[in-house]
A protein has these predicted regions:
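Binding-site signature for planar aromatic cofactors or substrates
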Residues: 1-198
């Protein structure tokens, strides 16, 4: 299928250097708030790129749960493929595609585990069903059927039917510490604005 004529013109207001904040994290916060105010669905969703020697680059969508001057935090299963890739090659990239605003933010840097205490703090805020799911989902592993997974969920729900649910040792957070943050604004005639913090 030839989709060469599938295009639209970007008519956004430009991005001038004088308008950018000195602190890239503050600039990200400003753009993130604008994306949120624009009712962009899952404005905290980003594409996370990792790599390994076996197949090379790999990418998937992940949800941002915290950001501050120390970096960008997301949570996942530590036994997942992405976690194994991060362990071997901690240099990663993330991309926020805020397409309705003709914007994207790209972050490149080093990914590192956060503390168990910090992971527990977030885990405790998750819905109970999601907490149970963290105990029974062997991410990136082949399972025999959907019913097998649902049975594991029922068993975990029964096991933790009373009281608080502990943090699984196989689940927790990562922080991406940026080396570069790039802000991109689409412009007409493909003369886009792009500014990079290093």
């Amino acid at each position: 299928m030839d989709i060469g004529d599938y295009r639209r013109e970007y008519m956004s207001q430009g991005l001038d250097r004088d308008e950018l904040l000195d602190d890239p994290f503050k600039q990200f916060e400003h753009w993130f708030q604008q994306a949120n105010d624009a009712d962009i669905q899952d404005a905290n969703a980003f594409s996370l790129a990792t790599t390994d020697l076996e197949v090379g680059p790999s990418i998937r969508t992940v949800l941002l749960k915290l950001f501050d001057e120390n970096g960008f935090v997301f949570f996942t299963n530590y036994n997942s493929r992405k976690s194994q890739q991060i362990k071997a090659y901690p240099q990663v990239a993330m991309l926020f595609p805020w397409l309705p605003l003709n914007r994207q933010v790209k972050v490149e840097g080093r990914c590192e585990k956060i503390s168990s205490a910090a992971s527990l703090k977030y885990f405790a805020t998750r819905p109970r069903g999601s907490q149970i799911g963290a105990w029974c989902s062997d991410q990136s592993e082949v399972i025999e059927s959907r019913s097998f997974l649902e049975q594991k969920y029922r068993e975990a729900a029964e096991k933790f039917k009373s009281g608080s649910i502990p943090l699984p040792s196989s689940w927790g957070g990562y922080r991406i510490v940026p080396a570069r943050i790039e802000f991109w604004q689409g412009r007409e005639n493909r003369l886009h604005d792009r500014f990079q913090y290093t």
